[in-house]
UniProtKB/Swiss-Prot annotation:
Its cofactor is Mg(2+); Mn(2+). It holds the Pfam family DXPR_C. It comes from the Bacteria. Catalyzes the NADPH-dependent rearrangement and reduction of 1-deoxy-D-xylulose-5-phosphate (DXP) to 2-C-methyl-D-erythritol 4-phosphate (MEP). It comes from Crocosphaera subtropica (strain ATCC 51142 / BH68) (Cyanothece sp. (strain ATCC 51142)). This is 1-deoxy-D-xylulose 5-phosphate reductoisomerase.
Length: 398
């Protein structure tokens, strides 16, 4: 029985993780739950899974959460704020922590879990993208396992099982192409929020669905792969694979290529991250290659996906630049979802923000440097958005 704490329990990753726990109660037990603000769903989860400790990041919701739990027949420890989430992450009984918090908000609780000696099932890619220079030394110092729980990096990790040290030659990340893979570039100026949220293959949260549409998601995954697997950026490629059956591939030194295949289902990488090195039997739909039909591939259109190149540039710049890229993207996507800027403005404000940070970058940033860069980038995006020409905006900034 593996005891786990779950950060971001009410989001897409969190609810799918709890589906796994519910299906395999003899394998996994939830001892900690944390979320940002969804009191109603968190209370339902507490009632079902009966964790020892619960936290809600939004401190204004603490009273509502306590009221919702008061009528239950047991009393978990209830906390609030960033420190409360960190306490869930470092909770003594947990062996593994699933990090499903969206964005850079997952960095500090993940560090808390690592410092407490917890293994990490990493579904929050921003932890490594922004904090890689700090997180990786901590992983080594505390001797914990860092297991990727997103589909692409789980696929790479699975393909690497049995590959000797030095055997990896190239990583090939597959991308669905997002909501606009079949749209002509000329039509992207007319994109609405509703258009961007129509992912063709995966069921995900709003932010990551927009990231898929811009291909920033894949660019961020390139940076994550660099940190996870120690691969130079020039040896990490992206290919559009519309069917999302091949979740990623590796090329080894003799040019053999290994791939991991499966229906697009986030539970698969989550289960592997929780159960590694074991393989647990599931009754989920098995992959039928005949039913899947043709598997096709094409090169990403650089004109359609400028965010992809911004990510490579930030990765190569190193230091705190990936943190700036990540924060700028989070802020830009939030503005787009709020209809404050247009879809095509997302890469514009990110590029301007990264350019303005270039002279302030440090090659070996501390955690404080990274957090400061994150804060600076969010403010810089707001300023860049204010300076956009009004002809490109969905509505003007308030």
């Amino acid at each position: 029985m593996k005891k786990i704490s779950l950060l971001g329990s009410t989001g897409s990753i969190g609810t799918q993780t709890l589906d796994i726990v519910n299906q395999y109660p003899d394998q996994f037990q939830v001892v900690g739950l944390a979320t940002r603000s969804n009191v109603e769903l968190l209370a339902t989860q507490v009632q079902q899974f009966r964790p020892e400790i619960v936290a809600i990041c939004d401190e204004s919701k603490l009273g509502s959460l306590k009221d919702a739990i008061a009528s239950m027949d047991y009393s978990p420890l209830i906390l609030a704020g960033e420190q409360g989430v960190a306490e869930v992450a470092r909770h003594g009984d947990a062996e593994s922590v699933v990090t499903g918090i969206v964005g850079c908000a997952g960095l500090l609780p993940t560090i808390a879990a690592i410092e407490a000696g917890k293994d990490i099932a990493l579904a929050n890619k921003e932890t490594l993208i922004a904090g890689g220079p700090v997180v990786l030394p901590l992983i080594e110092k505390h001797g914990v396992k860092l297991l990727p729980a997103d589909s692409e990096h789980s696929a790479i990790f699975q393909c690497l099982q049995g590959v000797p040290d030095g055997g990896l030659r190239r990583i090939i990340l597959t991308a669905s192409g997002g909501a606009f893979r079949d749209w002509p570039v000329e039509q992207l100026k007319y994109v609405t929020v509703q258009d961007a949220l129509k992912h063709p293959n995966w069921s995900m949260g709003q932010k990551i669905t927009v990231d898929s549409a811009t291909l920033m998601n894949k660019g961020l995954e390139v940076i994550e792969a660099h940190f996870l697997f120690g691969m130079d950026y020039e040896n990490i490629d992206i290919v559009i694979h519309p069917q999302s059956i091949i979740h990623s591939l590796i090329e080894v030194q003799d040019t053999s290529v290994l791939a991991q295949l499966g229906w697009p289902d986030m539970r698969l990488p989550l289960l592997y991250a929780l159960s590694w090195p074991e393989r647990i039997y599931t009754d989920w739909e098995q992959l039928d290659l005949v039913k899947a039909g043709s598997l096709t591939f094409r090169e990403p259109d650089h004109d359609k996906y400028p965010c992809m190149q911004l990510a490579y540039a930030a990765g190569n710049a190193g230091g705190a630049m990936p943190a700036v890229l990540n924060a700028a993207n989070e802020q830009a996507v939030a503005l787009f979802l709020a209809e404050k800027i247009a879809f095509l403005d997302i890469p514009k404000v990110i590029e301007k923000t990264c350019d303005n940070f270039r002279d302030h970058n440090r090659s070996q940033p501390s955690l404080e440097d990274i957090l400061e860069a994150d804060k600076w980038a969010r403010e810089a995006v707001l300023m860049a958005a204010e300076g956009l020409g009004t002809e490109n905006k969905v509505v003007s900034l308030k």
